[in-house]
């Protein structure tokens, strides 16, 4: 029997474009912080990926902070900042917020947008939240590459994303900042990522992230996810017509 992998919200298969970009980056010898030619070559790979993510996610290139995961990005944005949320958030966000916001028909009731953390889409139920006009933090990990979305018009001050949710490698994510919004670095000891996150960048992983982001944006514009939505609807209707007692969640 042929197995079909359906757990893409947990992690998605590596895209061929990401694999090719990562293989190419493996030959980059230098440290992207070094000023010699090898270092500049590695830096160019990082900045190419930053540009790809900037275009795919609708965020300024200088407002992207590369991290090791969306979990780290969430901590960088939320730790000790007194944010509130509903009780539906991923553990990476729930660890840093007060989960005291009520829900109404699956939607979080936002009362103080500037101090609210809100996920765009739930990894288990698939429920998509209606984002308010302004928002302190948005976990966009499950939305990028699947929903028509740009950080620039989302209304969020800060958002996070992860490479392996859209066909990139595990172990790399990013934080996105609205122009003028800053975060206090938690990893110190270097000036990488414009002083926001110290440590030598994961050049290979970032290369894969950029390529995956570009490919996912093409899939979205080509209508791939509209087709998947139709298939999902057919599946739901078929299950409902089976006569079995079903509860569709999401």
PLM regions and their residue ranges:
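Pyridoxal 5′-phosphate
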Residues: 1-250
């Amino acid at each position: 029997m042929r197995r079909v992998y359906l757990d893409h919200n947990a992690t998605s298969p590596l895209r061929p474009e990401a694999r090719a970009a990562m293989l190419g980056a493996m030959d980059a010898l230098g440290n992207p912080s070094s000023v010699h030619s090898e270092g500049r070559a590695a830096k160019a790979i990082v900045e190419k990926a930053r540009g790809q993510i900037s275009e795919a996610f609708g965020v300024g290139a200088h407002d992207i902070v590369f991290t090791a995961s969306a979990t780290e990005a969430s901590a960088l944005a939320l730790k000790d900042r007194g944010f509130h949320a509903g009780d539906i958030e991923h553990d990476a966000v729930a660890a840093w917020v007060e989960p005291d916001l009520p829900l109404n028909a699956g939607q979080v009731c936002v009362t103080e947008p500037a101090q609210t953390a809100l996920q765009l889409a739930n990894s288990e139920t698939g429920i998509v939240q209606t984002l308010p006009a302004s928002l302190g933090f948005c976990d966009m990990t499950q939305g990028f590459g699947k929903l028509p979305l740009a950080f620039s018009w989302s209304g969020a001050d800060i958002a996070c994303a992860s490479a392996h949710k859209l066909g990139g490698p595990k172990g790399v994510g990013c934080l996105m900042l609205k122009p003028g919004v800053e975060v206090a670095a938690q990893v110190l000891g270097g000036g990488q990522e414009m002083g926001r996150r110290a440590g030598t960048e994961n050049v290979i992983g970032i290369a894969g992230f950029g390529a995956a982001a570009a490919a996912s944006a093409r899939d979205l514009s080509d209508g791939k996810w509209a087709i998947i939505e139709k298939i999902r609807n057919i599946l739901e209707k078929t299950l409902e017509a089976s006569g079995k007692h079903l509860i569709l969640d999401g």
